[in-house]
Amino acid sequence: MKVLVVGTGAREHAICDALKDDVELYAYMSKNNPGIAKISTYKIGDEGEVDKVAEFAKENGIELAVIGPEAPLGKGIVNALEDVGVPCVGPAQESARIETDKSFMRNLFEKYEIAGSVVYKVFDNFDDIDKFLDEFDRDVVVKPVGLTGGKGVKIVGDHLRDNQDAKLYAKEVFETEMGGFAKVILEEKIVGEEFTIQAFCDGEHLVAMPAAQDHPHAFENDQGLITGGMGSYTDTDGLLPFLSQEDYDAAVAIMKDTLKAIAKETTPYKGILYGQFMLSKDGPKLIEYNARFGDPECMNVLPLLKTPMIDICKAVVAGELKEAEFEDLATVCKYIVPDGYPDTPHAGEIVEVNEEGIEKLGAKVYYAAVNEEDDGIHLSGSRALGIIAKGKTIAEAEEIAEKACGLVKGNVYHRRDVGTEALLQKRVDHMKSILDE
């Protein structure tokens, strides 16, 4: 079966890796990702030019496509591919609004009375924000409505000093039309521990994957700017050290209700639904949805998959999704990034990756924002590659991943604390202190 994967990063490399043994693999990517290039017939091009992607698919007789990144989903890539007869693991443009338009998501929760929502308000002029924040007595989160690559959200107490500071940032979002809209969402700040649940969806049925926890801050001990994610981990039981089965099930129930609401409001949602939750003293609260796999969380869950990925993909597009089986192992993923990231990254320099040594340790490497040229693999300005390891415990997986990171040479760094016992205990203690209040 001819399968096309659209996208350039480590997430797409992981998707390709999960499919490669069972399909004739094609890829459409914006840069020469060395990992994807090795295992596919590929074309370098702009993934956002959806008609050209559809033309490539038609010319090559593609029978199914898997869409990696969010931007092409927002531009209607699934609609374009389906118009030329290619079914997709990825939602149509209308349903992808669950990620591409945060006001659509919040309004959906309100209209269908879905659990796990937060106090929020959507603004289309600054004067109303000014008045609202003068009267609102809780800390807020400021969110652009559209896509910002995971870097547009700012939180009082983390990136912003107070609600007056939030006003200034909200004004910046308006004036620059950050995310493509002159709109801002203000939400109450929820205190707790973040976690992610990703799920396969066929429009009606939802199959949830193991929970993961991302580490968005650029530097160790949760310091620095918010990034697309510096690493993540999963545990052997599909839960997390601070996450109970009851809270996991409650989060999945929220996702199932969302799936039903999307079908009523737009078109049946077929693809990956990524729920980012905050576990609060009142249970899971939905922070946001993504309309695709997480990056890095995709790299945690797909290597655990026992059910062939292609079987799941075919079930998704056919509306016949039943189950997916995962190994009972823990995983730790650590992202290697250029020195200076995210502010002033060292782009263009060569990074040396000892793939053979990494594999001997039992780890995997998934290439992200790099470009392979004749003289080697060059860094760009973003995350370079993900190192993923499995183990019988999180500690075992972390030890393997950390050793593997030492086999990447260049002007790069990574968060050594991702998956460590000290950081996990910090998460557990934090959650306990919230529940004990």
Language-model segments: which ranges?
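ATP-binding N-terminal substructure of ATP-dependent carboxylate-amine bond-forming enzymes
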Residues: 1-94
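Active-site nucleotide/adenylate-binding loops and adjacent lid/helix of ATP-dependent enzymes
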Residues: 4-5, 99-183, 237-257
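Short arginine-rich
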Residues: 177-179, 403-418
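A cross-kingdom feature marking charged/low-complexity
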Residues: 418-437
